[in-house]
């Protein structure tokens, strides 16, 4: 397991799902983790994780989070942008509007995915970069998905994920000379609370939320992680490179564009 003792991470959107799993995975690797979410509760986490209630569409609240991190630890080594929106209310007035063509999409979904997702990641990355650039170290991980490269049933989703990947690439260009690395990371099918509740997915090649945290921990512990700056990475493929297994000991098969 990667050793992140002495390192400080901030994980956004950690109330549940992938974000929660990332926070737990990084804490298990020894990092001090600040975990944010609109409905997050400290009692749900163990040692090594400090929860902060934060709505990432509120710029002042986000700024306060970073002030708290800096005041508490004096450093920030990792930012993992997981906060997202737009999956709620997939069915409206009896219709599955999530897969409606773009001209029939409710505009609140654009606001949720682009504002709660891409814009929130940009704002958090701005604050993180200010701490990391001055220290000449740091890793920013933007959780993204194949919808950035292929139509997956929702135009807004594709636009928002493409924005995440382009943001990663351009941020990496500007961060390169400052010792800071930025990457996009694609999970596979993750056994989140929502996926398990749906009870309609083939979970034979699925990943636990904690698996994504283990992968990020391995990246953060790699002294040569800067060689990946600006890259789009597949979590399961990175896991194979570093010998990372899931919590049940399995090694999920990496997905490709043809698989999704």
What are these regions (language model features)?
Residues 7, 75-76, 97, 132-144, ...:
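Active-site loop of short-chain dehydrogenase/reductase
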Residues 8, 15-16:
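Conserved glycine-rich cofactor-binding loop
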Residues 29-44:
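Conserved glycine-rich Rossmann-like NAD(P)H-binding loop of the short-chain dehydrogenase/reductase
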Residues 47-60:
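Rossmann-fold cofactor-recognition segment
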Residues 85-86, 99-109, 139-163, 168-177, ...:
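Catalytic loop of short-chain dehydrogenase/reductase
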Residues 125-126, 169:
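A short, exposed helix-loop element centered on a Lys and neighboring polar residues
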Residues 184, 201-260:
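C-terminal helical subdomain
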């Amino acid at each position: 397991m990667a050793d992140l003792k002495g390192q400080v991470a901030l994980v956004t959107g950690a109330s549940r799902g992938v974000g929660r799993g990332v926070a737990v995975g990084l804490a298990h690797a020894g990092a001090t983790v600040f975990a944010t979410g609109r409905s997050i509760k400290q009692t749900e986490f163990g040692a090594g994780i400090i929860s902060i209630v934060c709505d990432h569409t509120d710029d002042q609240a986000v700024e306060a989070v970073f002030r708290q991190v800096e005041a508490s630890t004096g450093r920030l080594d990792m930012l993992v942008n997981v906060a997202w929106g737009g999956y709620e209310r997939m069915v409206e007035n009896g219709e599955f509007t999530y897969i409606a063509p773009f001209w029939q999409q409710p505009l609140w979904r654009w606001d949720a995915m682009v504002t709660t997702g891409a814009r929130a990641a940009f704002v958090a990355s701005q604050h993180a970069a200010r701490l990391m650039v001055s220290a000449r170290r740091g890793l920013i991980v933007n959780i993204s998905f194949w919808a950035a490269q292929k139509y997956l049933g929702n135009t807004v989703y594709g636009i928002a994920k493409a924005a995440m990947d382009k943001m990663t690439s351009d941020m990496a260009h500007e961060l390169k000379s400052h010792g800071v690395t930025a990457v996009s990371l694609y999970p596979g099918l993750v056994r989140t609370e929502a996926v398990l509740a749906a009870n309609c997915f083939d979970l034979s090649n699925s990943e636990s939320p904690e698996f994504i945290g283990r992968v990020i921990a391995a990246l953060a512990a790699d002294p040569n992680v800067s060689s990946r700056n600006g890259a789009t990475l597949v979590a399961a493929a990175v896991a194979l490179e570093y010998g990372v297994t899931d919590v049940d000991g399995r090694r999920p098969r990496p997905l490709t564009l043809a698989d999704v």
